[in-house]
């Protein structure tokens, strides 16, 4: 199990001065960011691939293959997008959603047969009409088991979905294939522009959720993931403005102690 954090300039400074430590740096599929980050620590790429919107056949699979040779990316991630035309309460529509996901995941696997595949749960949000059917844990489980795809479990996404459904987190998670967990994402939640939003620093309730996740892993209820990533901070308009050095300094060492590979060493490729 390795601990990763979103690459950012404040995190780079903390790493260079030895104030924090991480096993991996999590990067978007942007060459400039990858080039900067890989001088600091091993890098893995988090792709913006969506499954369920019909665009999987248009992906540049040669570019994806190149990313794997350039980085320490252990698997190809994708995001399960719900079909906004389907009724979440209709079993026929649920089966149609599963078929759409299975078809696109199979297409990816046929083009990248040697690359492990993981799919991420997305949150329910009023901004995305298809998000409710897309966050259905039963449909996620059926799809992943049918395609031998592992789970990238975003804990904050699950917490947001549970709030929207008035569902207990433990009940929601019990319906997911946690024995196929390969990557775990952690963030803080905050109300922002009227909505519960992720990718903020962790507050007390977020730490409680992270502690619970750690216990599920230690007890064997969940498979031990290869990577646990703190999705706080980053680059660009979405993440750059909420990247505070003090928050990184307070959070990263604590999470590294909880989830990190303490035997990791790295020599930068100068």
Give the ranges of each region predicted by the language model:
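Active-site acidic/histidine proton-transfer and metal-coordination neighborhood
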Residues: 58-150, 160, 242-247
């Amino acid at each position: 199990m390795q601990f990763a954090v979103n690459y950012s300039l404040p995190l780079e400074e903390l790493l260079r001065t030895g104030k924090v430590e991480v096993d991996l740096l999590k990067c978007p599929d942007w060459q400039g960011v990858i080039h900067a980050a890989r001088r600091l620590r091993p890098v893995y790429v988090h792709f913006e691939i969506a499954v369920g919107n019909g665009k999987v056949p248009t992906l540049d699979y040669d570019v994806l293959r190149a990313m794997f040779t350039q980085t320490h990316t252990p698997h190809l991630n994708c995001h399960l997008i719900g079909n906004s035309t389907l009724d979440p309460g209709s079993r026929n529509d649920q089966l149609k959603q599963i078929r759409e996901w299975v078809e696109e995941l199979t297409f990816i696997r046929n083009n990248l047969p040697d690359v492990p595949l993981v799919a991420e749960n997305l949150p329910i949000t009023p901004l995305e009409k298809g998000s409710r059917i897309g966050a259905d844990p039963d449909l996620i489980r059926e799809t992943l088991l049918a395609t031998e795809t592992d789970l990238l479990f975003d804990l904050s996404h699950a917490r947001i979905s549970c709030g929207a459904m008035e569902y207990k987190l433990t009940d929601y998670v019990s319906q997911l294939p946690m024995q196929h967990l390969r990557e775990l994402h952690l963030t803080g939640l905050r109300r922002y522009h009227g909505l519960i939003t992720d990718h903020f620093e962790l507050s007390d309730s977020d730490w409680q959720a992270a502690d619970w996740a750690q216990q599920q892993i230690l007890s064997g209820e969940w498979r031990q993931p290869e990577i646990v990533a703190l999705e706080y901070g980053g680059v660009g308009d979405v993440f750059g403005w909420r990247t505070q050095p003090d928050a990184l300094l307070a959070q990263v060492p604590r999470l590294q102690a909880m989830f990190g590979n303490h035997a990791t060493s790295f020599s930068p490729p100068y």
